[in-house]
UniProtKB/Swiss-Prot annotation:
Disulfide bonds: none annotated. Acts as a chaperone. Keywords: ATP-binding, Chaperone, Nucleotide-binding, Phosphoprotein, Stress response. It comes from Cupriavidus metallidurans (strain ATCC 43123 / DSM 2839 / NBRC 102507 / CH34) (Ralstonia metallidurans). HAMAP family: DnaK. Residues 612-635 are annotated as: Disordered. InterPro entries: ATPase_NBD, Chaperone_DnaK, Heat_shock_70_CS, HSP70_C_sf, HSP70_peptide-bd_sf, Hsp_70_fam. GO terms for molecular function: ATP binding; ATP-dependent protein folding chaperone; unfolded protein binding. Induction: By stress conditions e.g. heat shock. Signal peptide: none annotated. This is Chaperone protein DnaK. The modification Phosphothreonine is found at residue 200.
Length: 648
């Protein structure tokens, strides 16, 4: 059985890890980096770039370069968070037939899981290159506050990428695993994991206990905001730059997608620089042009200015911390360690706010970029049976229930319930002789069902005619270890039953997933063919270059017919290399190799002759030197000669 890899599928960056024995290993990608930008570019010729190559070309291809797609996964187009992003993203966010938020790229509509699958495929390939064997199984992390639709969509992304997703695990829980497995402290410890990433914020309170030599990780509570992260911090900087430039130059950059892409890059860079310095300069020549000529952008931003711009965003993270502490039934003073996860936690102001709230410094021995992937790899080794000394008890982040009479949300499973879990409750009909009931499933904390997120609905039909309130319909909720919900309804009188795995009444259908899997496989084949064609062209170019060079130096030593044959073979190979037929290129490479065999023999003979002359000249020079030396100092040479004889 192959390794189960751990993947942190991030909004801004992604990371992959495995366990070697008991030691976690974060794997470097093909560019040599331990994290990969979650950026995907769709090129004109059909090529798909992922990671650093996609990021490098974003400025010149903003409409077809997708980033922060995780913010759209499992969401409806009409949601206010999605509507907010439509005005900010340089790429098109469109409404799918099922009402989901999809993206529009080069005249095609793509589902967010399909786009995220490209990043997962890159992570899969990174692990395969390192391990030297195929990888088919993974543990993928999601924000703890992801709802059922978002978890399901992430699982779908894994399937499209060719991965069997063994477990969906919460990011803060994964970070706690990475932290806890590394420590040898005895006794129970309560830790707070504050996770502020590129697009999401989570806070989890977790208890780590030693139970008979087994480390038990129990999540006491979790809270967060799935639309708050580094992307929002970047946007505050971008808005500030646009405002300042408009005041100074009278030009609105927000309407220029090329300028926006350059501003996005500059804002991210400035934000990172201001974590270690007090001031930075944004310098973007030729940012735009008007009738008076080109315009240049030059602006200084201080750390204090950045902190003022994002203060409200940082403050927004504190309320979920209060709620999580309250829900866990602990006091702030009970927290033994605070762990910071996510790139945004490098910002000094974020660290200061966390310190003020928890009354202690956060741990500095956890890598905020890698801890989540490492934790996922540890969970992978637990699932594969390689580790048996770890028990993980996670929770469902939001309450689950159904709509009952009057539009009320009747909760079946409360938030922060340890998963997996089951719950059943008996309901009845609202009307006399009602032949069917519709079960509408919701997730959230509001009292009225419409204030919560609707996950799906289904019907139970064939109820025997009876007065209202008489039939007994048992509704059961079952949450698996991935946090994904299965709901059933059963008429106790007739035994009629209906069960579904909740897939938001949007989400991807099985047919759509299968089609995307096939597309991905076809793309992988196409990528392989494209790479083989590129290799063949490179080989052809190298052979043409070396043959031409040899022909220039040794051509006059060949007969005219031989020379013409080689030149014709070069031309044939050049023509083939311009085409797209790898077999044709290979055939012409062989033809040129055969045609230039005589030339190769001439080159080899010439090199041997040169080497022979060099050796002879060297020997002659040494002999001459010896003869010259003899008359000058005959005795020394004789004495040396006799001394050698004596030793024999």
């Amino acid at each position: 059985m192959g390794k189960i890899i751990g993947i942190d599928l991030g909004t801004t960056n992604s990371c992959v890890s495995i366990l070697e024995g008991n030691t976690p290993k974060v794997i470097e990608n093909s560019e040599g980096a331990r994290t990969t930008p979650s950026i995907i570019a769709y090129m004109e010729d059909g090529e798909i770039l992922v990671g650093a190559p996609a990021k490098r070309q974003a400025v010149t291809n903003p409409r077809n370069t997708l980033y922060a797609v995780k913010r759209l996964i499992g969401r409806k187009f009409e949601e206010k968070e999605v509507q907010k992003d439509i005005g900010l993203m340089p790429y098109a966010i469109v409404k799918a037939d099922n009402g989901d938020a999809w993206v529009g790229v080069r005249d095609q509509k793509l589902a967010p899981p399909q786009v995220s699958a490209e990043v997962l495929r890159k992570m899969k390939k990174t692990a395969e290159d390192y391990l030297g064997e195929p990888v088919t199984e993974a543990v993928i992390t999601v924000p703890a506050y992801f709802n059922d639709s978002q978890r399901q969509a992430t699982k779908d992304a894994g399937r499209i990428a060719g991965l069997d997703v063994k477990r969906i695990i919460n990011e803060p829980t994964a970070a706690a695993l990475a932290f806890g497995m590394d420590k040898n402290e005895k006794g129970d410890r309560k830790i707070a994991v504050y996770d502020l990433g590129g697009g999401t914020f989570d806070i989890s309170i977790i208890e780590i206990a030693d139970v008979d030599g087994e480390k038990q990780f129990e999540v006491l509570s979790t809270n967060g905001d799935t639309f708050l992260g580094g992307e929002d911090f970047d946007q505050r900087i971008i808005d500030y730059i646009i405002g300042e430039f408009k005041k100074e130059q009278g030009v609105d950059l927000s309407k220029d997608v090329l300028a926006l892409q350059r501003l996005k890059e500059a804002a991210e860079k400035a934000k990172i620089e201001l974590s270690s310095s007090q001031q930075t300069e944004i310098n973007l020549p030729y940012i735009t042009a008007d009738a008076s000529g080109p315009k240049h952008l030059n602006l200084k931003i201080t750390r204090a200015k950045l902190e003022a711009l994002v203060e409200e965003l940082i403050t927004r993270t504190i309320e979920p911390c209060r709620t999580a502490i309250k829900d866990a039934g602990v006091k702030v003073s009970d927290i033994d360690d605070v762990i910071l996860v996510g790139g945004m936690t490098r910002m000094p102001k974020v660290q200061e706010q966390v310190r003020e709230f928890f009354g202690k410094e956060a741990r500095k021995d956890v890598n905020p970029d890698e801890a989540v992937a490492v934790g996922a790899a540890i969970q992978g080794s637990v699932l594969s049976g390689d580790r048996t000394d770890v028990l993980l008890l996670d929770v469902t982040p939001l309450s689950l229930g159904i709509e009952t009479l009057g539009g009320v949300m009747t909760k079946m499973i409360n938030k922060n319930t340890t998963i997996p879990t089951k719950h059943a409750q008996v309901f009845s009909t609202a009307d006399d002789n009602q032949p069917a009931v519709t079960i509408k499933v919701y997730q959230g904390e509001r009292e009225m069902a419409t204030g919560n997120k609707m996950l799906g609905e289904f019907n139970l039909e064939g109820i025997a005619p009876a007065p209202r309130g008489t039939p007994q319909i048992e509704v059961s909720f079952d949450i698996d270890a991935n946090g994904i919900l299965h709901v059933g309804a059963k008429d106790k009188a007739t035994g009629k039953e209906n069960r579904i795995t909740i897939k938001a009444n949007s989400g991807l259908s099985e047919d759509e997933i299968q089609r995307m899997v096939k597309d991905a496989e076809a793309n992988a084949e196409e990528d392989k063919r494209a790479r083989e064609l590129a290799d063949a062209r490179n080989q052809a170019d190298a052979l043409i270059h070396s043959t031409r060079k040899a022909l220039g130096e040794y051509g006059e030593k060949l007969e005219a017919g031989e020379k013409e044959k080689i030149e014709a073979a070069i031309k044939d190979l050049e023509d083939a290399a311009r085409g797209g037929d790898k077999a044709e290129i290979d055939a012409k490479v062989n033809a040129l190799s055969e045609a230039s065999q005589k030339l190769g023999e001439k080159v080899y003979a010439d090199m041997q002759a040169q080497a022979g002359e060099g050796a002879a000249a060297g020997a002659g020079a040494a002999g001459g030197a010896q003869q010259q030396a003899q008359p000058q100092d005959d005795n020394v040479v004789d004495a040396e000669f006799k001394e050698v004889n004596d030793k024999k």
